Amino acid sequence: MLYLTKIRNAESEFTGNEQKIADFLRANVSELKSVSSRKMAKQLGISQSSIVKFAQKLGAQGFTELRMALIGEYSASREKTNATALHLHSSITSDDSLEVIARKLNREKELALEQTCALFDYARLQKIIEVISKAPFIQITGLGGSALVGRDLSFKLMKIGYRVACEADTHVQATVSQALKKGDVQIAISYSGSKKEIVLCAEAARKQGATVIAITSLADSPLRRLAHFTLDTVSGETEWRSSSMSTRTAQNSVTDLLFVGLVQLNDVESLKMIQRSSELTQRLK
């Protein structure tokens, strides 16, 4: 569980006191060994119970667990930084050579994968895979780079026998959404979770009784609130990566895991279909 990442991504939903706690923890993460909830409460002018509730909101049992986890994350981060002569977590600049850019991009994608995988609730993921496996029909929605991730997932699911619709046109996406039925699944892919087209489709799907699964960020959003299930992704995009490269990396890690999980549920038949698909496409060469 990456608590520093959760704190950063959940800022939009913090109350005033929660924001005080978050700011203190991030500013003093290197000194947390000597910080108690009592000392922290006194310094911030809030109650100890507020600090405990904040820790529980992030998924920890209490402040002690959160504090120890943050200390561990900080130490691990320092070790990774010291292991490389280049500060590969830093932003790409116009002065960087192609070699440096390549290393920074690679590190950014590695971080997106590490942080996304650290957030997985595998029991929930297994439940999601089971829900998808029973769906008579699956719709996948997304815009821009997220649409590309969705299209890739749709091809993989069709290859193992699922009925899937993944249309790029937003009007068609909306039309398909309103025709979904109970038992059907809509997989909505949106890092921001606030794109009106995707939210509209999710609303329509829920109204029809379909199950909505959102692949989105940790931040509070309309899509996150609409979804029956969420799969969290983490990405550190900057102005130099406007095409959402690390976001797609994180999203692809989630969709690939869904695909492999679905193959495992019916491995013999799935592998037969994958083999038949490969044989057919070979004949087209």
Swiss-Prot record:
Gene3D superfamilies per record: Glucose-6-phosphate isomerase like protein, domain 1 (3.40.50.10490), Winged helix-like DNA-binding domain superfamily/Winged helix DNA-binding domain (1.10.10.10)
UniProt xrefs under NCBIfam families: PRK15482.1
Record-annotated membrane-spanning stretches: none
Residue ranges occupied by any SIS domain in the UniProt entry: 128-268
Organism of derivation: Escherichia coli O9:H4 (strain HS)
Signal peptide: none
Pathway annotation from the record: Amino-sugar metabolism; N-acetylmuramate degradation [regulation]
Keyword check for Transcription regulation: yes
Domain HTH rpiR-type: 1-77
Molecular function (Gene Ontology), one example: carbohydrate derivative binding
The protein, known as: HTH-type transcriptional regulator MurR
The keyword Ligase appears for this protein: no
Subunit and interaction comment: Homotetramer.
Binding region for DNA: 37-56
Keywords: Carbohydrate metabolism, DNA-binding, Repressor, Transcription, Transcription regulation
Any one Gene Ontology BP term: negative regulation of DNA-templated transcription
Protein role: Represses the expression of the murPQ operon involved in the uptake and degradation of N-acetylmuramic acid (MurNAc). Binds to two adjacent inverted repeats within the operator region. MurNAc 6-phosphate, the substrate of MurQ, is the specific inducer that weakens binding of MurR to the operator.
